[in-house]
Amino acid sequence: MQRTCYIGELNASLVGQTVILQGWANRRRDLGGLIFIELRDRSGSIQVEVEPDSPAFHEADTVRAEYVLEVEGRFQPRPEEQRKGGLADYEVIALRVTVLSAAKTPPFELDKGESVAEDIRLKYRYLDLRRPEMQRHLMLRSRAVAAATAFLDAEGFVQVETPMLTRSTPEGARDFLVPSRLNPGEFYALPQSPQLFKQLLMIAGFDRYYQFARCFRDEDLRADRQPDFTQLDMEMSFVTQEDVLDVQERLLAHVFRTVLDYELPLPFPRLSYQEAMDRYGSDKPDLRFDRAFADVTDLFRGGEFGAFADAETVKVLAAPALTRKQLDELERVAKQNGAKGLAWARREGDGLTGGISRFLGEQAAALLERTGVEPGGTLLFSAGEWKKAVTALGAVRLALRDLFDLAAGGPRFQVAWVLDFPQLEFDEEAGSWTYMHHPFTAPRPEDIPLFGTERQGEIRAQAYDLVLNGFEVGGGSIRIHDPAVQTQMFQAIGLSEAEAREKFGFFLDALSYGTPPHGGIAWGFDRLVMVMAGASSIREVIAFPKNNRGVDLMAGAPSPVSPAQLAEVGVAVTTES
């Protein structure tokens, strides 16, 4: 027998008809001689009623949680007093119940999954994925893939797969290495991104490329990181930055409209990197709420309050009224992010009290005017070297968001572009310049003469990040297509011609065979779906993720391999004492 429909497809037009449904027993209860089974499939659930004189009763009496069933019965409305809306207004009166597969007692109650330790859920992921919430997340992901694919196909993009076994090249994180059995002592690397290959496809003349690319980075994990993850990777030839941003805005709006029935206003707001850091202390600001910083460096320059007078930057953030405990917690956040402390003062009437108020004097009135802090509200100050000061206060701003649910009053989704990143940043530990995005990012043409000068830190990149609700969900750039500029970039980061040729020789050769201007972007697809689904971690939108230690608890990976396997690929394992 084949089912007549999914449970979620049942509707009023089928009332009185006999239906065949297949799925899992969510729960079973006995009441007044009747057996009630809640039957679940990926589309929904419905109550099955089995009457004592039904030929289905004996089989139904054996059913326990998570048994796999086929139910044939009459679809009908429930008594009016029992209706709760939707499918809960209906039930199926069983004529036949067939147990297709029995089940052991699950290690946790599926309908209480959120209260179960995550490691247990991950160990029994195949059970965790039966939960309606998890199925909604993965089905949303599937619809997002389909929507993006349809849009890109219509825009003339060509889907091309790039190699999974490639050469190890420096991209910022550690590579996952794969020993070559046929070439002893040599290794492949799993790709951190398809960066060079997609640029080679532009050199090859494919004009517009995309793929849902699997990427691998051996780095420390956070709530929004996995060692293996998915990018929606795109590249376009003969384009300017504006061309790329236009396609991306229309693509993201299409995905949200198709999948969530949500309209993203176009065009997306834009901030420069400098503005984002200056106002929000982050290059991926959450713009669902404002709470921008005020710069008050000038109010304290040369003044008597030494902690602020000599600081490169003094920023202030207006916050609601805060308790001593809350202030202590926010100071802890500031210190975790590089600040020496978090100064504060409270508004009382037309003046300031508490904290550092006794040092403010004539600055108090100007502070109230610039910040617009509410009566009883608190001013939070961060002072010192610019990047440390704004970054610490940016972390405090996000802690305030979580403490007072500040984003709840804003739009459900807020997208923005962050542009004009620095091309280079100085690595204090190494004492040298390094790239901020990757070494193939094109600088602004007017800034190219600054390479090799004392002002090369001022070079702006033609780079752009796509930010959604405070998460970076995409990042890209216009690429260098002039071999001479690529050489200048390598020199700026201390890469000699010989080193560049050893690492990227095949790519540098390709650049010399006629390279079109080109640019692209990659979406962090797991992270995007996480935000769309309202999930707390990308592990909630990936079918079989690793935990925050990079371990697959279900399959038991990573795992030791036999000495014979190691010998076959010429690898010896040493353990540190």
Curated annotation (Swiss-Prot):
Catalyzes the attachment of L-aspartate to tRNA(Asp) in a two-step reaction: L-aspartate is first activated by ATP to form Asp-AMP and then transferred to the acceptor end of tRNA(Asp). GO terms for biological process: aspartyl-tRNA aminoacylation. Keywords: Aminoacyl-tRNA synthetase, ATP-binding, Cytoplasm, Ligase, Nucleotide-binding, Protein biosynthesis. It is found in: Cytoplasm. Belongs to the class-II aminoacyl-tRNA synthetase family. Type 1 subfamily. One of its GO terms (molecular function) is aspartate-tRNA ligase activity. PANTHER family: ASPARTATE--TRNA LIGASE, MITOCHONDRIAL (PTHR22594:SF5), ASPARTYL/LYSYL-TRNA SYNTHETASE (PTHR22594). Homodimer. InterPro entries: Aa-tRNA-synt_II (IPR004364), aa-tRNA-synth_II (IPR006195), aa-tRNA-synth_II/BPL/LPL (IPR045864), Asp-tRNA-ligase_1 (IPR004524), Asp-tRNA-ligase_1_N (IPR047089), Asp/Asn-tRNA-synth_IIb (IPR002312), AspRS_core (IPR047090), GAD-like_sf (IPR004115). Its main location: cytoplasm. ATP binds at residues 217-219, 226, 472, 524-527. Coiled coil: none annotated. It comes from Deinococcus geothermalis (strain DSM 11300 / CIP 105573 / AG-3a). Its EC number is 6.1.1.12. This is Aspartate--tRNA ligase. L-aspartate binds at residues 171, 217, 437, 479. It is an enzyme of class 6 (ligase). Residues 195-198 are annotated as: Aspartate. GO terms for cellular component: cytoplasm. The lineage of its organism: Bacteria, Thermotogati, Deinococcota, Deinococci, Deinococcales. HAMAP family: Asp_tRNA_synth_type1.
